[in-house]
Swiss-Prot record:
This is Large ribosomal subunit protein uL11. PROSITE patterns: RIBOSOMAL_L11. Transmembrane segments: none annotated. NCBIfam families: PRK01143.1 (NF002232). The keyword Cell wall biogenesis/degradation does not apply. PANTHER family: 60S RIBOSOMAL PROTEIN L12, LARGE RIBOSOMAL SUBUNIT PROTEIN UL11M. Part of the ribosomal stalk of the 50S ribosomal subunit. Interacts with L10 and the large rRNA to form the base of the stalk. L10 forms an elongated spine to which L12 dimers bind in a sequential fashion forming a multimeric L10(L12)X complex. Belongs to the universal ribosomal protein uL11 family.
C-alpha cells in the first residue's frame, strides 16, 4: 500500500469535505468512490462517529477498514440519550435492559479484551457505570457483581 489515512466520520454520512476530502485529495484514489464505499459500510452506525482506515495504492485502488464506535457512543445510541451524567454514581440518565446490554456487547466484542459475551457485557456495564446508566433498574456496578455471581449465566450461555 502506498499510504494509509485514518479518520473519524459520521456513520453513513461521510462526504468529500473535511476530514476526508483534504486527506484524500492529494492521493490517486477517486474521492467520491471512497466516500460512497465508506457510507455503504458505515450505514448501520447512523448518527455515530465511526473510525475508518483507508489504505490506497499508487494505481488508485483502495481498501477500507471500518472500526466500531466507542462503547459509550453505542450505549447512548441504544438507550437514547445525548450526554452522560456529571455525577454518574448519584444521578442516573437512563436505564438499559439486559437485552440492550448484550446487544452492545455483541457489537463491540471484536474490540474488547473479553473472550466471551458474559465478560464483554461486564466491560460494557463498566462503561454504563461511568455514564450514569442503570441496568435493569440497578446501579451498573451492582449488576456487574450479579453477572460475576452467576445470576445471568443461563442468559449468556446461548452464545
Amino acid at each position: 500500500m502506498a499510504g494509509t489515512i485514518e479518520v473519524l466520520v459520521p456513520g453513513g454520512k461521510a462526504n468529500p469535505g473535511p476530514p476526508l476530502g483534504p486527506e484524500l485529495g492529494p492521493t490517486p484514489v477517486d474521492v467520491q468512490d471512497v466516500v460512497n464505499d465508506i457510507n455503504d459500510q458505515t450505514a448501520a452506525f447512523d448518527g455515530m462517529e465511526v473510525p475508518v482506515t483507508v489504505e490506497y495504492d499508487d494505481d488508485g485502488s483502495f481498501s477500507i477498514e471500518v472500526g466500531v464506535p466507542p462503547t459509550a457512543a453505542l450505549i447512548k445510541d441504544e438507550v437514547g440519550f445525548d450526554t452522560g451524567s456529571g455525577e454518574p454514581q448519584e444521578n442516573f440518565v437512563a436505564d438499559m435492559s439486559i437485552e440492550q446490554l448484550k446487544k452492545v456487547a455483541e457489537q463491540k466484542s471484536s474490540d474488547l479484551l473479553s473472550y466471551d459475551l458474559k465478560n464483554a457485557s461486564k466491560e460494557v456495564a463498566g462503561t454504563c457505570a461511568s455514564l450514569g446508566v442503570t441496568i435493569e433498574g440497578e446501579d451498573a456496578r451492582t449488576f456487574k457483581q450479579r453477572i460475576d455471581g452467576g445470576d445471568f449465566d443461563d442468559y449468556f450461555d446461548d452464545e
